[in-house]
Amino acid sequence: MVNLGNDWDELLKEEFEKDYYLNLRKFLIEEYKTRQIFPNMHNIYEALKHTSYKDTKVLILGQDPYHGDNQAHGLAFSVQPQVKTPPSLLNMYKELKDDLGCFIPNNGYLMPWADQGVLLLNTALTVRAHEANSHKNKGWEIFTDRVISILSEREDPVIFVLWGSNARKKVELIDTSKHYILEAPHPSPLSASKGFFGCKHFSKINEILKKLGKEPINWQIENI
């Protein structure tokens, strides 16, 4: 049984008992037994474990985990310490530098964001090594859609950050009368120059948080 150790346990209890999830679980048990799967089995739910429902101020939506060795650890866009910063995250750092003057750190470990209430959620939480989107349409999207919907049902406003066409489709799950939506092209090198650079989302998030009377996010990731 999944134990997230915070308020998500109660909110997702019914989800973990649904047929689609039980089928997904069976599939994953077999996959982890017979193939190399990322992230490590114990890190699948890292995003939800580190950023509780109550503490979520911002949701940044990713797609599926990094599929290279030693990269993924359960937070969207983040990599383990001592691993080279991937291109999309490097572009996020470049935007942060232009937007807020942050220096570009020597690592891509985003746990400090998660600990401040930034839920770094991928739409699929697992992937086969070196095979992008290999766990697409296995059930994860139903599960992560439910996470988005649960946050949308909350009275306390959440800032939903949707980068790229896949993430932007999720806007239909969100009550836009209560919550804030920031949309832009994906920070990937393929699309960053089409409107991600210059979107100023990081400063916009902090402006909204201040307006809501909440502590802004310290976006600076320190060197390790």
Swiss-Prot record:
Organism: Clostridioides difficile (strain 630)
Gene of this entry: ung
EC number: 3.2.2.27
Locations listed in the record: Cytoplasm
Record-level GO BP terms: base-excision repair, AP site formation via deaminated base removal
InterPro entries attached to this UniProt entry: UDG_fam1 (IPR002043), Ura-DNA_Glyclase_AS (IPR018085), Uracil-DNA_glycosylase-like (IPR005122), Uracil-DNA_glycosylase-like_sf (IPR036895)
Matches recorded under SMART domains: UDG, UreE_C
UniProt entry tagged with the keyword Cytoplasm: yes
KW Repeat (keyword) present: no
Signal peptide feature range: none
Membership in a protein family: Belongs to the uracil-DNA glycosylase (UDG) superfamily. UNG family.
Cystine connections: none
Keywords, comma-separated and alphabetical: Cytoplasm, DNA damage, DNA repair, Hydrolase
One of the record's GO cellular component terms: cytoplasm
Role noted for this protein: Excises uracil residues from the DNA which can arise as a result of misincorporation of dUMP residues by DNA polymerase or due to deamination of cytosine.
GO function terms (MF aspect): uracil DNA N-glycosylase activity
Name assigned to this protein: Uracil-DNA glycosylase
NCBIfam families, A to Z: PRK05254.1-1, PRK05254.1-2, PRK05254.1-4, PRK05254.1-5, ung
Reactions mediated catalytically: Hydrolyzes single-stranded DNA or mismatched double-stranded DNA and polynucleotides, releasing free uracil
Catalytic residues, chain numbering: D64
Main localization category: cytoplasm
